[in-house]
Amino acid sequence: PGKMLLVDTVQGRVIDDQELKEEYAARQPYGEWLNSQLVNLSDLKIPNQKVPQYSREECQRLQKAFGYSYEEVKTSILNMAMNGSEGIGAMGIDAPLAVLSEQHQSLFGYFKQLFAQVTNPPIDAIREKIVTSTTVYVGEEGNLLEQKEENCHVLKINDPILTDTDLLKIRNMKVDGFRVAEISTTYYKNSSLEKAIDYLFIQVDRAIREGMNILILSDRGVDEYHIAIPSLLATSAVHQHLVRTKRRTEVAMILETGEPREVHHFATLLGYGASAINPYLAHESIKQLID
C-alpha cells in the first residue's frame, strides 16, 4: 500500500517504486534546499510573554457565547483530552438536520459527509504512516509550477492543531521571510454580519499590501458588545476572497478561535482553507475540567 509501479511502454519495462522516486528526487538538490530554508516550529524560542488566562466565570461566559453545551464539554472535549481520540459511538445520527431545525444551530452542523466512510481498523497517521501525515507547511507557496529553493522557505508544523504556546511562538517569530499579521474576526453587535465580512476583506488586503504572508484570524475579544464571525464563515470567506483576487498562494491562514470543539469542526475548518487552528477555548475548557 502506498507504493507505485510505472509501466513504461517506451522502454518496454516496469519501473518499481524505489527507482521511480529516486529519479524524481535526484532532479534538484531538494535536501540542501530544505536544510537551508525550512524552519521548524519546534525550534522557535518561546517568547517571554504570557498566554491569556481566563477565570472560571469568564470561561463559562465564552462557552455560552460560542454555543458550547454541557454534553460537548463533558463527553466530547473531556474524552479527547483523556484519551487523545474522539469518543466511539454508533453510526448514524438521529438529530434533525440543521437546515430543518427550529433551534439555533452551529454553522458546522450544516455540513455533512456525502457518505459514511468506515475502515476496520481505523486509518490514521499512526497506523498508516506510509500514506498519511499530519504535518503542515505554513508560509508563502510561491509558483507551484517552478522548482526553486525559495519555495522551501516555509514553517513546518507537525500538527495542524496548535497549542497556545505554539501560536505564541508563531505570532512573535522573528525569522527573515516571515511576516505575521493578526486580524480580528469580531465585530460590534449593532453592526451587520455582511459589513463585518467586508471589513475583514479590507484588513486582509491591507496586510498583504504591507507584505504579510501569515495571517492569524482571531476571535479573542468576544464580550457583551462584540460578537465573532462564525469561524467557518470567516475562513471560507477569506479563502474565496484570496482566490478571486489571485493571491491565495501568497499567504497562509491560521485560526485562533474559541468555536471548534469537535473533530468535525476541525475537519471543516481545514477543508475550507485554514492551515492550522488554535482552539483556545477548548484548551481552556480542559484546564477548567482538570481544576
Residue ranges and their predicted role:
Residues 9, 13-186, 192-199, 205, ...:
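Extended, highly charged accessory segments
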Residues 6, 178-291:
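Glycine-rich phosphate/ribose-binding loops and adjacent secondary-structure elements
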